[in-house]
Swiss-Prot record:
The gene is PRO2. The lineage of its organism: Eukaryota, Viridiplantae, Streptophyta, Embryophyta, Tracheophyta. The keyword Cytoplasm applies. GO terms for cellular component: cell cortex; cytoskeleton. This is Profilin-2. Transmembrane segments: none annotated.
Amino acid sequence: MSWQTYVDDHLMADIEGQQGNHLAAAAILGNDGSVWAQSTTFPKFKPEEITNIMKDFDEPGHLAPTGLFLGGAKYMVIQGEPGAVIRGKKGSGGITIKKTNQALIFGIYEEPVTPGQCNMVVEKIGDYLVDQGY
């Protein structure tokens, strides 16, 4: 299965069978910031934004004072799982980032998708990839 298939058929799929109820954007990036696959809606990001995200996985709390930036958009960092999951909020939407051994799984949501639904979608794929050795 290609990385793009994971994005298109899993991360961007309708949630709980509700047509049109899906993440706003998603991507799988290598831990070095290289894009493995992304939705057409995923924001163009700066390398230093990924560097800062990786630093927060290594040093939990690093992003809390400044916020998480992706594609120039600022997210307020909310409770995640230190070293494994970063969650952010921006208005009525937000972001979930799951770190695996080799990759970062990104999910960006807007209403009507809930934070919990985004977490479920992103973390499910992330956990699967960890189980597969990625």
